[in-house]
């Protein structure tokens, strides 16, 4: 099951393993939405093998319940407290940018691109 978690966690720049009724999962999702993060979520309570996924995550995270478990760039960042610590220290956004997970809106042209692909057209003109 650890192999499945590793595979799922590397399919997108940011993957959140959570549960549909988990408040702290909602907190992380809200933070990422406000930061403009493109993320995927895997709700373990909706997965037929969710208990096995939770056991694998508990071994990786080192606690139970193991959700939310946040992966950025395929690497385990941790649960909510570690995500928030990174955010408060100013280290979360650079990590998200490096993983290609931040989406920014170009207000002049009204489209959305990943932050690492945003072209500054104002400097060209």
Curated annotation (Swiss-Prot):
One of its GO terms (cellular component) is cytoplasm. Keywords: Cytoplasm, Disulfide bond, Electron transport, Redox-active center, Transport. Residues 2-103 form the Glutaredoxin domain. InterPro entries: GlrX-like_pln_2, Glutaredoxin, Thioredoxin-like_sf. Disulfide bonds join 22-25. It comes from the Eukaryota. It is found in: Cytoplasm. It holds the Pfam family Glutaredoxin. The keyword Transport applies. Belongs to the glutaredoxin family. CC-type subfamily. Has a glutathione-disulfide oxidoreductase activity in the presence of NADPH and glutathione reductase. Reduces low molecular weight disulfides and proteins. NCBIfam families: GlrX-like_plant. PANTHER family: GLUTAREDOXIN. This is Putative glutaredoxin-C2. The gene is GRXC2.
């Amino acid at each position: 099951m650890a192999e499945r978690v590793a595979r799922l966690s590397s399919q997108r720049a940011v993957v959140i393993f959570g549960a549909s009724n988990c408040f702290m999962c909602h907190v992380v999702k809200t933070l990422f939405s406000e930061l403009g993060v493109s993320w995927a979520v895997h709700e373990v309570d909706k997965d037929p093998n969710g208990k096995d996924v939770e056991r694998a995550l508990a071994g990786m995270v080192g606690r139970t319940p193991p959700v939310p478990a946040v992966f950025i760039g395929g690497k385990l960042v941790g649960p909510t407290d570690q995500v928030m610590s990174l955010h408060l220290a100013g280290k979360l956004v650079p990590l998200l940018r490096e993983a290609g997970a931040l989406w920014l809106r170009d207000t002049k042209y009204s489209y959305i691109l990943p932050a690492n692909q945003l072209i500054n057209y104002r400097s060209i003109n």
